[in-house]
């Protein structure tokens, strides 16, 4: 017996970006000189960032048309409204979620951002928490 449902659409796309993790160049936890050394992340390096964005929809008849949604998100980067440079996957996700939340309010948003389709972040943004408040809580923790 089904007692309720929550529906999502999802889109995937890729964008090229250059970024760096400045702390990696000098933080002893990152610049270890051992097998786990990641100090190379402190210099600019290129990635193809892979996105998977899920958006809650309110009905099953193209509440949000996913091809249009995908193009809308791609254009944010292609028209330089958003940039990937020098941001972590989590930062990229938060910035994208702010835009989506403003355009499509009161919907759950799920975003995956991966470097080269290999490693990345996955974040769920729930409409019951104001996005800016949630991000401030995380940054202040």
PLM segments and residue spans:
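Charge-rich, low-complexity N-terminal segments
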Residues: 1-141
């Amino acid at each position: 017996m089904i007692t309720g449902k929550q529906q999502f659409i999802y889109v995937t796309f890729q964008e090229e970006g250059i970024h760096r993790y400045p702390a990696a160049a000098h933080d002893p936890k990152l610049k270890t000189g051992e097998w786990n050394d990641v100090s190379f992340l402190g210099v600019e390096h290129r990635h193809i960032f892979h996105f998977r964005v899920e958006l809650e929809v309110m009905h099953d008849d193209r509440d949000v048309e996913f091809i249009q949604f995908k193009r809308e998100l791609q254009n944010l980067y292609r028209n330089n409204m958003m940039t990937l440079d020098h941001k972590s996957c989590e930062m990229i996700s938060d910035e994208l979620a702010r835009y989506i939340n403003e355009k499509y309010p009161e919907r759950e948003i799920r975003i995956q951002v991966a470097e080269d389709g290999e490693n990345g972040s996955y974040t769920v943004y729930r409409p019951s928490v104001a996005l800016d408040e949630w991000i401030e809580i995380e940054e202040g923790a």
